[in-house]
Structures are given as C-alpha cells and as structure tokens.
Amino acid sequence: MGKTGPQPGRRLGSGRGWRAGAAFALGVLIAAALVGLTVRFQLDGPARWFWILVVVATALAVLALRATGRRSASRAVLLASIIGALGWWLTIRPLGDRDWAADVAYGVTARIEGQTAILDHVRNFDWRSKQDFTSQWETRRYDISTLSSVDLATSTWDNPAIAHTLVSFGFSDGAYLTFSAEIRRERHESFSEIGGFFKKFELVLIAADEADILRLRTNIRREDVALYRLNLTPAQRRALFMTYLEKANQLAAQPAFYHTITANCTTIIFQMARLVAPGIPMDWRILLSGYLPDYLHDHGVTDAGLPLEELRANARISAKAQQADPAIPYSIAIRAEDPSKR
C-alpha cells in the first residue's frame, strides 16, 4: 500500500484557526489598551491603578479562556466587558464648573444690542513669563458695522506640521479681537495630545486682546507665529464674527469636550467657516494645521498674487514682535512692515 499523502485541507484549516486566534488576541489587546488609556486619563490615585489592574486581568482571562478551548465563555466575558466599558464611556460628560487654570478660567460670552456686540470675559493678561502674569478679564463693546479685516494666525513650536490656529478680527478704530479654541485645563493639568482622544479636556473659546494671546506666543513662549490676511467680503467677515459669538454662547450653555482630531483649534475654525461658505472642501491640511496656509492659498482665501513661500515669509511676525519698541502698540508693531495688514 502506498503512503498516505499530505492533507493540505487540514493544514489550511489549521492555518485559518491560527490566524483567527491571532486576530482575536489582537482585538482583545487593542480593546484593553483603549479602555486602559481611558482609565489613565479619567481616574487618579489608587482608583486608576485598581481599574488598570482590572482591565489587564480581564484581558488575560479572556485570552486564557480562548486558549483552553472555552470560546463561548471567552466571547461572553469579552462582550460583557465591552458593554460595561461603553456604558462607562457614555457617562463621562463635559462640565463647566471645574477648578480651571487661570488663563482658561472663563470662556467668552456675548450679547447683541443693535449693531453693538457686548462681550463678557475678554482676556487681557499682562504676561511677564509663562508662570508670571497679571490676570484681567474685561467686558468690551464692539461696533459690528466697523469690522474691517480678518486675519488667521498660526503658531508652531516643535513640529511645523502642527500649528495652533487663531482668528483675529480688526475694526476700523484700530481695535483687534482674537478668538482661540483651546483645551480647558484644570489647575493641575497639562496638555496631552493623547488625552485629547479620551475626553480628558473640555473645549473653551477664548476671546483676547492680541497683546495678550499673540504676544504670549511670540514673546513669552518664543513660538513661530505667522499672520495671514484673509480675503473675505464684508458680509463674510460679519457672518464669521457672529458665528464665533454663537459658538461661544453655545459652549457656555452646553460644555463640550476637546478632541485632538475632530474638535480642536483648526477644525472648529473650519466648521464655522463652512457655516459661512458651505462649499469649501475638506482637506488633509485641515488636520495637519501647519499646512493650513497652503490650503487657504490654493483656494484664494489669502493673497493668491504671491508665491506661497513668499507669502509664508511675509506672514511671520515673531521676530518683529520681539524686536518692537515697547511704546508701539503690539497690533501695530506686528503689522508694521506689511501695509496690507494695517
């Protein structure tokens, strides 16, 4: 009798089983990592470590049940754990009454009386260093009919592909008001990009004087800041300004979480811009905000008559701000060499 030949079907089935087991294990590890990171950013002290141990023990139990052939039990434990984790995730709500860091203690709110916008909690800090400053929150009045310009500011530090973005509105009397969507840190917190995926921070809309919020970045933090004049019609300028005020009041009434991808300084600008101009397309440069000026240049929102590199070079203001005569108002100093921004 001849020898029994190889049984490829059995080997193939065995291979499929191995791959299915590996995929299951990978899924368990990813789920455990996501839940563990949520615990890491939501809990403090002994509770954090207790629940991290629970997550690890549950993942090991699921894998052990699978490895010993008790697949139904493994799936049941995994499903129950996922349902429990999702249920907890849905209970994590944004709050508006935490012990906030001084620079985000208040979000701006607004009310309209005729052509006048009255803004409460406009920030006007005097920064001497990152930790040494004089706090000042003001109520200001702006004549909406005198809106004369809109500038986009970008601020980069370590990675040129990632920028913080701000929008500054100019008025015919020489006043400027800058809006910035920021994480709302508590006093003991520091920023974490990863934490922004796990409901770690609330979102706040800050309205501030340029001599506060831009000078902090140019002169105190020494970041690379650029200022781009946007080509908007008077109607678009007004609509964008009003959209910011509406967003500010909305956040005051209904707090929201900051999200590293979907609700950050740049995506908030994009969402509001789409309310003004619904046809503007989504683009990868909205997420990699350091390239936002390229996107705006391509769509004619900035000065399309200049090559992009020249536009970028002309827009940089940090050196001008640092070298300016302190007697010259900050907003004039950073625009001094660019008549189009006066």
Language-model segment annotations:
Residues 71-94:
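Internal/C-terminal transmembrane anchor helices
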Residues 13-62, 246-342:
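Activation targets extended, charge/polar-rich intrinsically disordered C-terminal tails
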Residues 118-124:
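Acidic, Ser/Thr-rich low-complexity segments on the non-lumenal side of membrane proteins
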Residues 1-14:
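Short, Lys/Arg-rich, polar N-terminal cytosolic tail immediately upstream
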Residues 198-275:
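Soluble catalytic domains of enzymes that build or remodel membrane lipids, polysaccharides, and related
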Residues 117, 128-225:
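Glycine-rich catalytic cores of cysteine/serine-nucleophile enzymes that process amide/ester linkages
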Residues 52-78:
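Cytosolic-side transmembrane helix boundary signature
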Residues 94-113:
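Alpha-helical transmembrane signal-anchor/signal-peptide segments
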